[in-house]
């Protein structure tokens, strides 16, 4: 109704329709998003961006045929748009005969190519060369892209160390039993956490394939609820001495009310905000019945997978330097060791390699931990039509495969700085 009012007051334009489509797409209302993108296209039929936006919706819901149809139309209009080329590469497995590979390399080498476009091309070429098994050509492009990102977004790894120092200091005397009977008892979200590229999307897809579960993706509301309840900035940690029983109830109620409002229809909801493990102690006190699933993966494969992906600007800034990656990972291990000691029964850990080697055993373990009865369709997670917005969008739309295991062996010499950092 709000947008109907806006359209009556404002002159209808493609730009306005695109903005509304973006809002609905972000809210995972794919059909409504497509409706507004189509309205925009009626006004500007040659606008390449609209084709790309439609392609993005189709990719998120797993319709790769329409995805490629739309992105190819966008590329036909703007053949040298590197964002479109990157999108194309990330929407299918690239064969060695695909002309896009040499086209991207030509653009990469062109002097007039901007620094940012060269970064995008570096990651896109990496994906294309790996798909086509041209592994010996990969690393110069991958390293160039990461080095440039590291220059654009410098990161002091001491930030991760000091943040964990604070967590350990504030929760040094934490005992979950001290909070028995407190918090919001009715709240039971399922938090899926871990390092990026560790398999969290796969785990969420398996669990959310259950008829009683809605997969909400990366919600990120827990930090907001904590911040506005206790009066701290969203990402600032707080001492337990400032947390009162009524705070815990309010935090839990805020999170659960938000999830139930935005993701109605099922009794269980997953939140794949992967960094939530840092707030595990406080959230377990605020919601005694919430679940935490920590996904672990061989760090050599996990960190390589991080290194070969470009994240949203100003996020995961440790990702673009091998030494920083190793140090950050060791800090992840450090804080998980801390929580394992403080709340050993507060979460379960699942190993990515175990999951793909024996899917049913470990999928059943996950479903059982969530207090749900087993459903066979949890093993057919790739058939789910829910919208997915992560870098793993291609992988979780197909049955479990093992080609990503020991991928680090292809680049063993190039990754030596990383291996030394995680020793």
Where do the language-model regions lie?
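Position-specific recognition of the canonical hydrophobic site in helix A of tetratricopeptide repeat
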Residues: 18, 22-25, 52, 59, ...
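Structural marker of alpha-solenoid helical repeat scaffolds
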Residues: 9, 43, 77, 110-114, ...
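PAPS-dependent sulfotransferases, especially Golgi type II membrane carbohydrate sulfotransferases
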Residues: 89, 101-116, 121-189, 236-242, ...
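Phosphate-binding active sites in nucleotide-utilizing proteins
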Residues: 179-285, 295
């Amino acid at each position: 109704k709000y947008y109907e009012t806006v359209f009556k007051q404002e002159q209808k334009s493609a730009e306005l329709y695109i903005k509304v489509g973006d809002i609905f797409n972000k809210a995972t209302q794919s059909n409504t998003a497509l409706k507004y993108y189509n309205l925009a296209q009626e006004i500007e039929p040659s606008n390449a961006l609209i084709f790309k936006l439609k392609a993005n919706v189709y990719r998120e819901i797993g319709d790769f045929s329409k995805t490629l149809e739309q992105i190819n139309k966008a590329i036909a209009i703007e053949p040298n748009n590197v964002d479109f080329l990157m999108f194309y590469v990330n929407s299918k497995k690239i064969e060695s005969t695909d002309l896009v590979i040499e086209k991207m390399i030509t653009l990469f080498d062109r002097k007039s190519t901007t620094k940012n476009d060269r970064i995008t091309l570096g990651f896109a070429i990496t994906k294309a060369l790996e798909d086509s098994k041209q592994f010996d050509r990969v690393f110069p492009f991958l390293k160039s892209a990461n080095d440039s990102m590291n220059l654009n977004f410098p990161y002091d790894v001491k930030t991760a160390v000091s943040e964990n120092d604070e967590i350990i200091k504030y929760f040094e005397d934490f005992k979950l039993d001290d909070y028995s009977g407190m918090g919001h008892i009715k709240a039971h979200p399922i938090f899926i956490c871990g390092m990026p590229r560790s398999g969290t999307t796969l785990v969420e897809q398996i669990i959310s394939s259950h008829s009683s579960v809605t997969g909400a993706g990366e919600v990120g509301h827990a930090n907001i609820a904590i911040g506005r309840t206790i009066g701290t900035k969203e990402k600032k940690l707080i001492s337990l001495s400032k947390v009162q029983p009524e705070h815990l109830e309010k935090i839990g109620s805020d999170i659960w009310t938000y999830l139930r409002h935005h993701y109605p229809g099922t009794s269980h909801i997953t939140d794949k905000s992967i960094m939530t493990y840092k707030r595990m102690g406080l959230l377990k006190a605020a919601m005694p019945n919430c679940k935490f699933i920590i996904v672990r993966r061989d760090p050599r494969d996990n960190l390589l997978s991080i290194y070969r992906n470009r994240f949203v600007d100003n996020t995961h800034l440790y990702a673009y330097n091998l030494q920083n990656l190793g140090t950050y990972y060791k800090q992840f291990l450090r804080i998980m060791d801390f929580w394992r000691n403080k709340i050993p029964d507060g979460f379960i850990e699942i190993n990515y390699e175990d999951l793909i080697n024996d899917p049913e055993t470990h999928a059943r373990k996950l479903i059982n931990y969530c207090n749900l009865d087993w459903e066979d369709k949890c093993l057919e997670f790739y058939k789910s039509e829910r919208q997915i917005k992560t870098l793993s969008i291609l992988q979780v739309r197909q049955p479990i495969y093992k080609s990503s295991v020991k991928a680090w062996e292809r680049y063993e010499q190039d990754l030596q700085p990383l291996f030394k950092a995680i020793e």
